Design a protein with these regions (language model features):
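Surface-exposed, low-hydrophobicity segments enriched in Gly/Pro/acidic/Ser residues
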Residues: 1-476
Length: 476
């Protein structure tokens, strides 16, 4: 294992990879994470299925699905589906469930809603719009080693980030105070249509659509507080250090904000953002060191850091550090655009992009290189897959065809902890040989009626490899 320093601007969160499972989990995320290692949550997710757009041609565990934005939401985006009282403080009125609004019951009561040929018409008649209220796609079910989920906080992390036009849908079942609730449908419960012999549509909770819309509720389900440390391999707690700094114009990087309310004056950013509440024995006593809590503030296998606040440089920082501070002053130190705009737009606010994460981390480079145990592999003959997905040469991996070595260069794949399979064409099976042919002809005319000549030929073969196939021995 090697120790390395890192520095990262905190506008560079990891998008299209980490998601909250419903608006309830978003509303309660900060509270649930506020007293680590004790979890302020009575949730326990027991089962989950994760479905993504089937881009790799998988035929098993693949089917037509419809992801619905409002399914399971007590306060649906389309108010016409609301059945629970608005603003209720009763926890039973806030919990996500298929019965939380009328959308799911309306769909399953329609006998044609599960037919792939008619489901789009059914959804249109309900007033639902594609890419906004729902997404229909042919999806594959991820295996359990292709993602991580926190069963108490209610967030999901994929091993490999989704492409912008890919769809993500889930079904999950959880308990709360001993009662069982479910959002979406599990594939084992919705089998083939026995009458027509076709696979029935599976209804899921939509977490990501084919387009990013900041005005829709699912925008808030994509987490913007998870950062990659760009490390090959897994994180190790030993010698791990992390600090949060503010780049003050003309003054450099500081551990403190230049201006805060008096109640938190003198507190470092790492404390303000609840990243330092514990000592090395996990007692609630800040010690100036990042709180390394596996599965909560750190995802070691993925090489990720999770902030315990959903908007650490937006509204959350405002509520913590700038109470009673004039908004004209506080807005100089806040970065709300990071959570209100798509990432590429938010990064254009250079005057607000002043937060930096730096420290040191120990990890392993193991697994970055794969030996093919062959030499002089034919160029272009190597195919690499991760979790069934075809990787791109030059983007995800590089090949030294002479030495027969594949090097994975995509840190997301290395840290994902999923199997990488390599197939290639081996020259050994072709008995490749070098051949040489030489010939000489000499003629001498002694007289008009007499001449004589001499001819010599030589054919030789030299195998490229010391071992040759039987019957293909080199000649000389």
């Amino acid at each position: 294992a090697s120790t390395q320093r890192f520095q990262k601007r905190l506008d560079d969160y990891e998008e299209n990879r980490h998601f909250l499972l419903s608006q309830y989990f978003r509303d309660n995320f900060n509270k649930s994470m506020s007293n680590l290692p004790v979890i302020n949550s009575q949730f326990q997710i027991k089962r989950m299925e994760v479905w993504v757009t089937n881009r790799n041609g998988q035929t098993t565990n693949a089917r037509d699905v419809v992801g619905l934005m409002d399914i399971g939401e007590p306060a649906p985006h389309k108010a016409s589906y609301r059945t629970r009282p608005s603003g209720s403080t009763n926890i039973n009125d806030q919990l996500p469930d298929n019965s939380a609004n009328s959308l799911y019951s309306k769909l399953i009561s329609n006998g044609t809603s599960r037919n792939p040929a008619s489901v789009s018409s059914v959804l249109t008649m309900e007033g639902l719009r594609s890419a906004e209220d729902y997404e229909r796609t042919f999806a594959r079910k991820l295996t359990e080693n292709e993602y991580f989920f926190n069963p108490q906080i209610g967030f999901l992390s994929l091993n490999i980030p989704l492409q912008p036009d890919e769809v993500l849908g889930v079904a999950f079942q959880y308990t709360y105070n001993g009662k069982v609730f479910q959002v979406g449908e599990f594939s084992e419960n919705i089998a083939l249509d026995q009458n027509k012999g076709v696979q029935q549509i599976l209804f899921l909770k939509l977490l990501k659509a084919t387009t990013q819309r900041t005005d829709l509720p699912i925008w808030d389900l994509m987490m913007k507080n998870v950062y990659s440390l760009d490390l090959f391999g897994q994180l190790q707690q030993q010698d791990f250090q992390l600090n949060i700094l503010y780049e003050e114009p003309s003054a450099g990087l500081k551990r403190y904000l230049p201006v805060t309310s008096k109640a938190v004056e003198g507190k470092s950013l790492i404390k303000l953002l609840n990243l330092d509440r514990l000592n090395n024995r996990n007692d609630p006593q800040p010690d100036g060191v990042f709180d390394y809590v596996e599965g909560y503030t750190v995802l070691s296998k993925m090489g990720r850091v999770v902030f315990p606040l959903l908007e650490p440089f937006g509204d959350d920082l405002k509520n913590i550090a700038f109470k009673d501070i004039d908004s004209n002053v506080s807005k100089k130190y806040l970065y709300p655009q990071l959570y209100r705009n798509i990432k590429s737009e938010a990064q254009t606010y250079a005057n607000l992009n002043r937060f930096v994460m730096e420290g040191q981390v120990k990890g392993s480079n193991g697994g970055a290189e794969i030996s093919l145990n062959a030499f002089n592999v034919p160029p272009g003959s190597v195919s690499v897959r991760a979790g069934g997905q075809i990787l791109k040469e030059g983007l995800d991996y590089m090949v030294d065809y002479g030495s027969g070595t594949v090097r994975i260069i995509n840190p997301g794949i290395l840290s994902s902890n999923i199997p990488v399979n390599v197939s290639f064409e081996n020259n050994i099976g072709f008995g490749f040989q070098e051949r040489g042919f030489r010939a000489l002809r000499l003629d001498y005319m002694a007289s008009k009626n007499f001449n004589f000549g001499f001819s010599s030929t030589r054919l030789s073969e030299r195998p490229f490899f010391t071992k040759t196939n039987f019957g293909s021995d080199p000649i000389k």
